[in-house]
Amino acid sequence: RGRGLHNKARELVNILCESFIEMTPNREHNYCCGAGGGVINCGPPWKGTRMVNSREKKAQIERTGAEVLIAPCHNCHSGLEDIVEHYGVDMEIKFFGDIIYEVMEKTIYQEKK
C-alpha cells in the first residue's frame, strides 16, 4: 500500500471495468479493512473488536455506491466480507484476480489426436 504497488492494479481496473469508483480517501490514506497482516486469523475473540473498529470502513464502502468491491488479497477479502456481512452492506466482493479472469479470452483445451 505504501510503496505504490497498487497503482498498476488501478490502471488495470480502469481498463477492465466499465465504471471504476475510487474510495475516498484512497491509496496510502485508505482505511484498513482490519484484516491486515493476517490479523483476521486471530479468530472469533477479536472479530467483535474488528467490527467495531470497521465502522468507518463500512461508511467509506457505502459512500462509493458501487455494486462490487474489489479485494486485492485474501486477508482483505475476508476482512471486507466480515464487514459487509456484519453491517448488512448490499455489495458483492470479488478478488482482483477474478476480475481479470472474467474478462480473459478463454479457449477450451482439446487434446490433439
Where are each of the predicted segments found?
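Iron-sulfur cluster-binding electron-transfer modules in prokaryotic oxidoreductases
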Residues: 1-113
